Amino acid sequence: MRTATITRETKETQIYLTLDLDGSGRSEIDTNIGFLDHMLTLLAFHSDFDIKLTAHGDHENLGMDPHHLIEDVAISLGKCINEALGDKLGIRRYGSFTIPMDEALVTCDLDISGRPYLVFNADLSGNQKLGGYDTEMTEEFFRALAFNAGITLHINEHYGKNTHHIIEGIFKSMARALKQAISIDETKVGKIPSSKGVLRAN
C-alpha cells in the first residue's frame, strides 16, 4: 500500500497528516484556515488521494499570520508523497493537466524526478487575502511541496482575473497532474521510469 503518516511538531506548528495515494478522494481537513481547507479538499478529490490532516499554528494564539502553518502543511504533504511513493517502481512519473476555472486557465506540468524545482507564473495580486489565507503564500506552498516531494513542478497561469479562480485552478491542475504521474504504467511494472535506474538528485 502506498501510504504515509507524519507528525510534525515545532514551536510554530503542530501537524498530523495521513496520506493514501490509492484512495478515493476522501478527506478530513482541519487547518483553521477555511480557504486552505477548501483547496486541500479539492486536491484530495481530484487526485483520488485520501488525506486526513489536523494542523494548528502560532497564528491561532499569538496573532501571527498563517505563514508558518501553510508552509509546514506543504512540507508535511510533500514528505508524505515522497515516502508513500517509495522506490517509485512502475509509476508514469510525468503529469500534465490544464484546468479552465471560469475565466481563468491554469496548467500544471510535473516530473517526479527526485530533482526538486519550482517554476511559478501566476499573478495573484488582484486579491491579497481570501479569508485568513494570504494569497502570496500559494507560491511558497507549492515550493515547499515540490522540494519535499522531490518533484520538478511548473505552474503557469495562462490568463485569469479572479484570484480565487486562479488558485483553485492551480490546486485542481496539480491534483490531476499528480494523479497521472503516480499512476502505474502497466508496461513498466517493477521498473524505475528512468534511464539512470534511479529517481533522485545526482
Swiss-Prot record:
Its main location: cytoplasm. Pfam families: IGPD (PF00475). It is an enzyme of class 4 (lyase). Pathway: Amino-acid biosynthesis; L-histidine biosynthesis; L-histidine from 5-phospho-alpha-D-ribose 1-diphosphate: step 6/9. One of its GO terms (biological process) is L-histidine biosynthetic process. It catalyses: D-erythro-1-(imidazol-4-yl)glycerol 3-phosphate = 3-(imidazol-4-yl)-2-oxopropyl phosphate + H2O. PROSITE patterns: IGP_DEHYDRATASE_1 (PS00954), IGP_DEHYDRATASE_2 (PS00955). InterPro entries: IGPD_sf, ImidazoleglycerolP_deHydtase, ImidazoleglycerP_deHydtase_CS, Ribosomal_Su5_D2-typ_SF. One of its GO terms (molecular function) is imidazoleglycerol-phosphate dehydratase activity. It is found in: Cytoplasm. Transmembrane segments: none annotated. Keywords: Amino-acid biosynthesis, Cytoplasm, Histidine biosynthesis, Lyase. Its EC number is 4.2.1.19. It comes from the Bacteria. GO terms for cellular component: cytoplasm. Gene3D superfamilies: Imidazole glycerol phosphate dehydratase, domain 1. Belongs to the imidazoleglycerol-phosphate dehydratase family. PANTHER family: IMIDAZOLEGLYCEROL-PHOSPHATE DEHYDRATASE, IMIDAZOLEGLYCEROL-PHOSPHATE DEHYDRATASE HIS7. HAMAP family: HisB. This is Imidazoleglycerol-phosphate dehydratase. It comes from Lactococcus lactis subsp. cremoris (strain SK11). The gene is hisB.
